[in-house]
Amino acid sequence: MIEYKNVALRYTEKDVLRDVNLQIEDGEFMVLVGPSGSGKTTMLKMINRLLEPTDGNIYMDGKRIKDYDERELRLSTGYVLQAIALFPNLTVEENIALIPEMKGWTKEEIAQKTEELLAKVGLPVAEYGHRLPSELSGGEQQRVGIVRAMIGQPKILLMDEPFSALDAISRKQLQVLTKELHKEFGMTTIFVTHDTDEALKLADRIAVLQDGEIRQVSNPETILKAPATDFVADLFGGSIHD
């Protein structure tokens, strides 16, 4: 379990997060949603210590995150960004191999897992493994990014607006794929988006942020039927749902 306890972050005169309390269960798909500047990405970056809170603590399995070895923490956490961060001079296979190599996997183990995961995301290794990122579409690059984040079998997968720059068809395909992989591998997924439709589609629970504070945490059905504040009601008022 991941737990934020009274977490705050302050830059000079600006409160980025204020008294954030949130529990994320093992294996849960938690979506953080809110407008730009609401603190979503800040919360995400605190999990692998890219940012440190000025007050409060974040716990993983009962232990403060700041007490974990930083390298081991990051190797146990997958990260997928909006900006597709593949190394341009490395092939698809070489990009994917980076984390397993750091973990000391054999070449055979890396090759087997790479082939397995690329097949799952619809990119057969025989066809795509030797390609450079420049030879892939945006959607294909993001699929490789997902494989790279997952190949090390992380306990936690962090996804920061990973599909917002993609076309509608690619975005929908990757939403379905991400949910399927989350269920198959049983990891805890924390997903940041400003898109309420995406949040409703993916989440087990949604945490709604405004001005550095959490306004509501609940499942999608409750968010729609019983919004806790006018802000939550307005934010989800235009959402398209079944």
Curated annotation (Swiss-Prot):
Positions of ATP binding: G34, P35, S36, G37, S38, G39, K40, T41
Cellular component GO terms held in the UniProt record: plasma membrane
Protein name (record): Probable ergothioneine transport ATP-binding protein EgtUA
One GO term (biological process): amino acid transport
Localisation per UniProt entry: Cell inner membrane
Traits of the deletion mutant: Lacks ATPase activity in vitro. Does not import ergothioneine.
Endpoints of the signal sequence: none
GO-annotated molecular function: ATP binding; ATP hydrolysis activity
Domain ABC transporter: 2-236
Alphabetized Gene3D superfamilies for the sequence: P-loop containing nucleotide triphosphate hydrolases (3.40.50.300)
Family: Belongs to the ABC transporter superfamily.
InterPro entries: AAA+_ATPase (IPR003593), ABC_transporter-like_ATP-bd (IPR003439), ABC_transporter-like_CS (IPR017871), P-loop_NTPase (IPR027417)
Organism, as annotated: Streptococcus pneumoniae serotype 2 (strain D39 / NCTC 7466)
Protein origin, superkingdom: Bacteria
SMART domains: AAA
Function, as annotated: Part of an ABC transporter complex EgtU required for the uptake of ergothioneine (EGT), a natural low-molecular weight (LMW) thiol antioxidant. Probably responsible for energy coupling to the transport system.
Keywords: ATP-binding, Cell inner membrane, Cell membrane, Membrane, Nucleotide-binding, Translocase, Transport
Entry keyword Translocase: yes
Subunit structure as annotated in this protein's UniProt entry: The complex is probably composed of at least an ATP-binding protein (EgtUA) and a transmembrane protein (EgtUBC).
